[in-house]
Structures are given as structure tokens and as C-alpha cells.
């Protein structure tokens, strides 16, 4: 079965793997997934990620991050836009996630950025997901 929403699949795999306390999870490679993972790493939600190839297909191995009590750093990660329902926002109407404790990831004309960066640059875009 073909995956039509690679971002949604990635978010689900990250959520499920962190809930059962896996050390890592393998995801299908896509530029959007790579951009989102760069933000998650920069914001401290994952340890790291690297690329590996199995039978000619490139995967991304994500090393998940836990606190000192072995609780996942990612408490909740949810897709906002889907292939059938794209949600856009201007920088003025950008929603806050968990009263500023979470992050919003958006796809803008300047690439995939956080909601805070979008407000600072005064650009809007498609709301991809929220993380806290």
C-alpha cells in the first residue's frame, strides 16, 4: 500500500516509538521529513538523525530523546494539515502551542520553519504540525 501522506506517517511513527520508549525509529526519506527533523533536532525534541540505505531505498534513522526519568521529550506531536485539508495562516494569526511551550512547524516560501521564526520574518504558510 502506498503512503500518501509521508509527513503524517512520520509523525505517527515518532509518536508511537517514543511512547513505547524505543531508542530509534526508521522513516522513509523525503525532503519534507528531513526539514521537519532538522527543526526537531534544533529545538531539542530528538537526539539526532542519520541516513541509511536498505535495498536501494534511503531511510532516515531518528534517535529519540528521553529525560533522565526515561520519559519521552515529545509529549505530543500532531499533524495539522493533511493532503485533503491544507490549513494556512498569516503570521498575524499564527496559533500558540501550549501557551508558548510547544512549537509550530510551518511550510513557508522560505522553507520549513517554526512558527516563531515565521512571526519574526513576518511570513505565513501552511501549518504542518505542532509539537510539545
Curated annotation (Swiss-Prot):
- Sorted alphabetically, which InterPro entries does this protein's record hold? Ribosomal_uS8, Ribosomal_uS8_CS, Ribosomal_uS8_sf
Q: Which keywords annotate this record?
A: Ribonucleoprotein, Ribosomal protein, RNA-binding, rRNA-binding
One of the GO biological process terms: translation
Q: Which domain of life is it from?
A: Bacteria
**GO terms for molecular function, please?**
rRNA binding; structural constituent of ribosome
Checking SUPFAM superfamilies in the record gives:
Ribosomal protein S8 (SSF56047)
User: For this UniProt entry, what's an example GO CC term?
Assistant: ribonucleoprotein complex
List the Pfam families: Ribosomal_S8
Description of how the protein assembles with itself and partners: Part of the 30S ribosomal subunit. Contacts proteins S5 and S12.
Function statement: One of the primary rRNA binding proteins, it binds directly to 16S rRNA central domain where it helps coordinate assembly of the platform of the 30S subunit.
Similarity comment: family membership: Belongs to the universal ribosomal protein uS8 family.
Its name, as the record gives it, is Small ribosomal subunit protein uS8
